[in-house]
């Protein structure tokens, strides 16, 4: 378990685009779950107090699985679509953690 990586990312939808971003995030989560056996958890969340704020909680079996995720063509397509449709504003905040046990 010590090789497990946990990724926490915060994403802010552009004003009025929360529902569209939520739909895209749910779609992306389904693709990742099916395409990436090294991804243990890939779960988007929406804030209960701010409908335009989202958090991703992700876990990968090891650094190689996370690297495969970052290089996956479906991730590139997701980012391209997010940009093209103007779904987000600001910078995506990402923190990566290594399991202690």
What kind of feature is each model-predicted range?
Residues 3-35:
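N-terminal first-folded block
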Residues 1-5, 43-52, 78-101:
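Glycine-rich beta-strand-turn "strand-cap" elements at beta-sheet edges
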Residues 4-12, 41-71, 95:
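Short, well-ordered beta-strand segments in beta-rich or mixed alpha/beta enzyme
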Residues 27, 31-40, 59-93:
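An amphipathic, aromatic/His-enriched active-site/gating alpha helix that lines ligand/cofactor pockets
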